[in-house]
Amino acid sequence: MQLNDFDYYLPTELIAQQPAQNRDASRLMTLDRVNGELNETIISEIAALFRDGDLLVINDTRVIPARLLGKKESGGRVEVFLVRRLLEPGEVWQCLIKASKSPKPGSLIILSEGVVARVLERSELDTWAVSFSPVEGFLDRLERIGSMPLPPYIRRSAGDDDRERYQTVFARAKGAVAAPTAGLHFTDALLQKIRQQGVEIAPLTLHVGLGTFMPVRVDDLKDHRMHREYYFIPEATARAVNARKNDGGRVVALGTTTTRALEHAAAGNGSVQPGEGEADIFICPGYTFKVVDALITNFHLPKSTLLMLVSALAGKDRLFNAYNEAVNRNFRFFSYGDAMFIY
């Protein structure tokens, strides 16, 4: 398949710049992937779409304030964007560095609260390996000196409200540099309402990384190499997923990141393996899903790997018909936008 097969027209005014006033007030398009039927409701009513015995799997990663402003030793301004941790302990991170000139290995960047970054060496995807000191309490300092890493299509600076709204209510494990956006719509009350439908909710962790922002750089998708993202699946979650599959029940993934973790962890014999690893699975049309039966997800960028993943589950023609309808109905797109339930 070709990259251009996943392009579509989107008016810029439909790209959400702010979250909905209330998390569960966003619109929800439902898509039956068997017959293509489309319907519309709102997130606060999503519990009615679940069945007794369903398993909802969520991603409990927590977004870190990954964007840092500092100065070179010469005084020039530098922006450092943390991508993922390479070494712990030691606080060595893969980073993007934006400055007037490319940094040199060994150079220092002076940040707030006495934090100093040392550029070590080039890494992958135009990034650098950077060590931060002092090591002790680094993530706590980051909460104070960093800003939330809003995606580039949100044309404003991150504010204090984004520290709450660009974070799920169940965020726990620090490490993501982008939110698992489907989860942003859910409140504690809504999750409880879903449980009352007879639905079990199980967590996993996948730290959303730089690849979320990176464009696909090849025309032929068979040449694309997927980025890697750290994940951890607890034993209890793996047991719950495998039991549901063995019983013929339905596994509902909250978001594409949850989907990637589950499908990567089941790549061997189809049974989800507990533990940690790095997911680099590329899911596009033609892929046979081993775990996920239904998906809650936002509307994704043209030509993105997330759009390809959703196309693989829903069927490309049905999904693009749904996207065209969403544009016609003025749905809001991307991270702070509306959502879909594909079943």
UniProtKB/Swiss-Prot annotation:
It comes from the Bacteria. The keyword Disulfide bond does not apply. The gene is queA. One of its GO terms (biological process) is tRNA wobble guanine modification. GO terms for molecular function: S-adenosylmethionine:tRNA ribosyltransferase-isomerase activity. Transfers and isomerizes the ribose moiety from AdoMet to the 7-aminomethyl group of 7-deazaguanine (preQ1-tRNA) to give epoxyqueuosine (oQ-tRNA). Gene3D superfamilies: QueA-like. Pathway: tRNA modification; tRNA-queuosine biosynthesis. This is S-adenosylmethionine:tRNA ribosyltransferase-isomerase. One of its GO terms (cellular component) is cytoplasm. Monomer.
